[in-house]
Amino acid sequence: MTNGLPKHERLKGRHWFGVLFEQGRSIKRFPLKLVHTPVPEASQNLFGVSVPKRNVPAAVRRNRIKRQIREAYRLNKSIAEAHEFGALFFIYQGRESLPYTRIEQLVKELLLSYNNSIKKKNVVDEI
């Protein structure tokens, strides 16, 4: 598996955002929130990131936070690809920028929690 984040792995289109916010579940580790939903027909996870303008008004800071979250996900996406694929959408809810090491730690925690929730769901489905 490569460490890239190709275009076909990016979350795009109204359909997926509608499904995510209607049926998706969320995991929170302030200031990051992960909204996820399973996508049975997917061959890899679909990924998206958002930093609201209301929380971070300066575009330069918003873009930097988005780049940091994308990079942390790109390097750690193998954690989330262990069981089944889904749509993953990260939302930055803080008002202040964090160092990259903290963002990477939060992304790892969220991906591990996502993995655990998928495992629990699969165990319940088998019973």
What would you call each of these model-derived segments?
Residues 1-127:
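Positively charged, solvent-exposed patches that mediate nucleic-acid binding
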